[in-house]
Amino acid sequence: MIIDKVLGNLHDLPENDLAAYTGLHREKVVLPSAQLVKRIQRATTDHGNEIGIRLASGSGDLRDGDILHVADTNMIVVSVLPTDVLVIAPRTIHEMGVTAHSLGNRHLQAQFFDADSEYGAAVMVCAYDHTVEDYLTHAGVPYTRQERVLPVPFRHAEHSH
């Protein structure tokens, strides 16, 4: 089976639309976050069924909860594996600036969340790296190491020096 579009996302559906999928069995395509940025890929569901994903250019990244296929009694949904991340919570704007600058020099991929997010504080989230953890420990910057399903995958930012 070739999937060429995402039909919707379970996390975005209004409650009354979600009810239409209630009786369906959910077959999962379990993907690590890094695979979400690939438009063309082969995947195997948790039932051992192979599928091809061939999304149109510009269609956006896959996300946790994306509905790939719906049949009579079954649906195929993307399930994203948690990513090992460092959740960095600087105490001051100065500490944030110094930390972001130091980590930015490493061309580290990061995401930023405000206090209204699921983190409950303004934080910077980056993929786990032992050298970053060592820097944070030595600099005294508060952080925690967590396993998280991120709303969007880390993506390399193009640049030149």
From Swiss-Prot:
What InterPro entries is this protein classified in? UreE, UreE_N, UreE_N_sf
Q: What are its GO biological-process terms?
A: protein folding
The keyword tRNA processing appears for this protein: no
Question: Per UniProt, what is one GO molecular function of this protein?
Answer: unfolded protein binding
The record's annotation in Pfam families points to: UreE_N
State where the protein is found. Answer: Cytoplasm
* GO CC terms of this entry: cytoplasm
**What SUPFAM superfamilies is this protein classified in?**
Urease metallochaperone UreE, C-terminal domain (SSF69737), Urease metallochaperone UreE, N-terminal domain (SSF69287)
Gene3D superfamilies named among the record's database cross-references: Urease metallochaperone UreE, N-terminal domain, UreE, C-terminal domain
Q: List the disulfide bonds.
A: none
**Record keywords, A-Z:** Chaperone, Cytoplasm, Nickel
Domain of life, per the record? Answer: Bacteria
This molecule's function is given as: Involved in urease metallocenter assembly. Binds nickel. Probably functions as a nickel donor during metallocenter assembly.
HAMAP family to which the protein is assigned, alphabetical: UreE
Q: Which NCBIfam families match?
A: PRK13261.2-3
Of which family is this protein a member? Belongs to the UreE family.
- Protein's recorded name: Urease accessory protein UreE
Species this protein is from: Pseudarthrobacter chlorophenolicus (strain ATCC 700700 / DSM 12829 / CIP 107037 / JCM 12360 / KCTC 9906 / NCIMB 13794 / A6)
Q: Encoded by which gene?
A: ureE
